[in-house]
Protein backbone atom coordinates (compact mmCIF):
# COMPACT_ATOMS: atom_id res chain seq x y z
CA UNK A 1 0.00 0.00 0.00
CA UNK A 2 1.30 3.46 -0.88
CA UNK A 3 2.16 5.72 2.02
CA UNK A 4 2.42 9.48 2.17
CA UNK A 5 4.08 11.90 4.58
CA UNK A 6 2.33 15.19 5.35
CA UNK A 7 3.05 18.18 7.57
CA UNK A 8 0.14 19.98 9.17
CA UNK A 9 0.32 23.35 10.89
CA UNK A 10 -2.71 23.76 13.13
CA UNK A 11 -3.61 27.23 14.40
CA UNK A 12 -6.15 28.47 16.94
CA UNK A 13 -6.54 27.55 20.60
CA UNK A 14 -4.53 24.36 20.22
CA UNK A 15 -2.03 24.52 23.07
CA UNK A 16 -2.94 23.68 26.65
CA UNK A 17 -6.10 21.82 25.55
CA UNK A 18 -4.72 18.26 25.13
CA UNK A 19 -4.55 18.73 21.35
CA UNK A 20 -1.28 16.83 20.87
CA UNK A 21 -2.30 13.98 23.15
CA UNK A 22 -5.67 13.67 21.42
CA UNK A 23 -3.97 13.76 18.00
CA UNK A 24 -1.72 10.92 19.17
CA UNK A 25 -4.74 8.78 20.11
CA UNK A 26 -6.42 9.48 16.77
CA UNK A 27 -3.21 8.73 14.85
CA UNK A 28 -2.77 5.44 16.70
CA UNK A 29 -6.38 4.51 15.90
CA UNK A 30 -5.66 5.22 12.22
CA UNK A 31 -2.29 3.38 12.34
CA UNK A 32 -0.33 6.52 11.49
CA UNK A 33 3.27 7.12 12.50
CA UNK A 34 4.46 10.61 13.25
CA UNK A 35 4.69 13.32 15.85
CA UNK A 36 2.97 16.39 17.25
CA UNK A 37 4.79 19.33 18.80
CA UNK A 38 3.97 22.80 20.09
CA UNK A 39 5.58 25.68 18.23
CA UNK A 40 6.62 29.00 19.77
CA UNK A 41 3.92 30.92 17.86
CA UNK A 42 1.13 28.97 19.63
CA UNK A 43 0.44 26.56 16.78
CA UNK A 44 0.90 22.79 16.68
CA UNK A 45 2.95 20.99 14.03
CA UNK A 46 1.94 17.46 13.09
CA UNK A 47 4.01 15.15 10.89
CA UNK A 48 2.06 12.11 9.72
CA UNK A 49 3.02 9.05 7.68
CA UNK A 50 0.56 6.36 6.66
CA UNK A 51 -1.83 5.20 3.99
CA UNK A 52 -3.49 7.89 1.91
CA UNK A 53 -6.98 7.28 3.39
CA UNK A 54 -5.63 7.23 6.97
CA UNK A 55 -3.65 10.46 6.58
CA UNK A 56 -6.67 12.12 4.93
CA UNK A 57 -8.83 11.00 7.87
CA UNK A 58 -6.32 12.49 10.32
CA UNK A 59 -6.39 15.75 8.35
CA UNK A 60 -10.18 15.88 8.75
CA UNK A 61 -9.83 15.21 12.50
CA UNK A 62 -7.20 17.96 12.83
CA UNK A 63 -9.72 20.45 11.44
CA UNK A 64 -11.91 19.76 14.50
CA UNK A 65 -9.50 18.63 17.21
CA UNK A 66 -10.64 17.70 20.72
CA UNK A 67 -13.65 19.38 22.33
CA UNK A 68 -11.49 21.81 24.35
CA UNK A 69 -9.69 23.15 21.26
CA UNK A 70 -10.69 25.82 18.77
CA UNK A 71 -9.10 25.17 15.39
CA UNK A 72 -8.86 28.27 13.20
CA UNK A 73 -6.95 26.67 10.37
CA UNK A 74 -4.91 23.70 9.15
CA UNK A 75 -2.18 24.18 6.55
CA UNK A 76 -1.11 21.00 4.75
CA UNK A 77 2.14 20.40 2.89
CA UNK A 78 4.05 17.44 1.52
CA UNK A 79 6.76 16.29 3.93
CA UNK A 80 8.42 13.41 2.07
CA UNK A 81 11.76 15.16 2.66
CA UNK A 82 11.20 14.85 6.44
CA UNK A 83 10.49 11.10 6.43
CA UNK A 84 13.66 10.53 8.49
CA UNK A 85 12.05 12.46 11.39
CA UNK A 86 9.11 10.05 11.66
CA UNK A 87 9.37 7.75 14.71
CA UNK A 88 8.22 4.12 14.76
CA UNK A 89 4.97 5.11 16.52
CA UNK A 90 3.37 8.49 17.16
CA UNK A 91 5.11 10.77 19.64
CA UNK A 92 4.10 13.91 21.46
CA UNK A 93 7.08 16.23 21.74
Residue map of PLM features:
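Intrinsically disordered, low-complexity, mixed-charge
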Residues: 1-93
Amino acid sequence: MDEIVRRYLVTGKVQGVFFRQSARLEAKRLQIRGLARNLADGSVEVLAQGSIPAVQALHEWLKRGPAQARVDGVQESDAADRKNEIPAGFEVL
